[in-house]
Amino acid sequence: MSLPESFALTAEDAKLLLAANVHLGSKNVQVHNEPYVYKTRPDGVNVINIAKTWEKIVLAARIIAAIPNASDVVVCSSRTFGQRAVLKFASHTGATPIAGRFTPGNFTNYITRSFKEPRLVIVTDPRTDAQAIKESSYVNIPVIALSDVDSPSEYVDVAIPCNNKGKHSIGLIWWLLAREVLRLRGIIPDREAEWSVMPDLYFYRDPEEIEQNAAEEARAGATEETEEVVAEAETEWNTETNVEDWADSGVTAAGEEAAASQW
């Protein structure tokens, strides 16, 4: 699929894709994903053609932008690395997120409170989100999936070939997809203009790491406060006092007390 020049992959986006290891696939290849393989490295890792990755991102964005009601798009991620990206994508595009475990019957059992009737489903991994894809096939909902070269392609209508196991790769693909959707909707008016949202916002962050960083910052702040208090105390102790002033003030006070006693 050849894209117009306005939709072509830029050098900056290509650098981002390579930096996030989007092009590094698994060692096994599913037969339907062979056209996306650029070459196989000596260590057995299959390299994905990022030009085809970008073509599928543009195609998926055009499908999403064609749906009038943004909330009719459901984005799913059972994989931990994709849950933050799914929530951010939903907040920027208006889609409906399902982060975490997909409850069976979400698309088929209308009695459940979480029942949904979406017009499009986007999943992070066809393996971990297999339940969502299976239920979508029952009710004829098209599916877009972030697909590695070893991912199953059953009931997947649009597969975006990429590394769907790394946190940076997953976050960047969702970021590029959100940016392209906003461009097609006209929210980002100029394709040359940069989006104010950074890709880092879509990357997974470990809660324990966040707590450790907060604790280290608190310790650093406490250390700085202690050093300031010690420095102030040292300056107070090092200041020289005038003994003559003390003596004069003592004599004056004694004279005033004697005069008051005579009265």
Swiss-Prot record:
Domain of life: Eukaryota
Intracellular or extracellular location(s): Cytoplasm
Compositionally biased tracts (Acidic residues): 224-245
Modified residues (N-acetylserine): 2
Record-linked InterPro entries: Ribosomal_uS2, Ribosomal_uS2_C, Ribosomal_uS2_CS, Ribosomal_uS2_euk, Ribosomal_uS2_euk/arc, Ribosomal_uS2_flav_dom_sf
A GO molecular-function annotation: structural constituent of ribosome
Region feature Disordered, mapped onto this chain: 213-245
Transmembrane segment boundaries: none
Chief place of localization: cytoplasm
Example of a GO cellular component annotation carried by this entry: cytosolic small ribosomal subunit
Sorted UniProt keywords: Acetylation, Cytoplasm, Ribonucleoprotein, Ribosomal protein
Oligomer status and interactors: Component of the small ribosomal subunit. Mature ribosomes consist of a small (40S) and a large (60S) subunit. The 40S subunit contains about 33 different proteins and 1 molecule of RNA (18S). The 60S subunit contains about 49 different proteins and 3 molecules of RNA (25S, 5.8S and 5S). Interacts with RPS21.
Purpose: Required for the assembly and/or stability of the 40S ribosomal subunit. Required for the processing of the 20S rRNA-precursor to mature 18S rRNA in a late step of the maturation of 40S ribosomal subunits.
Family classification: Belongs to the universal ribosomal protein uS2 family.
Protein name: Small ribosomal subunit protein uS2
Organism expressing this protein natively: Clavispora lusitaniae (strain ATCC 42720) (Yeast)
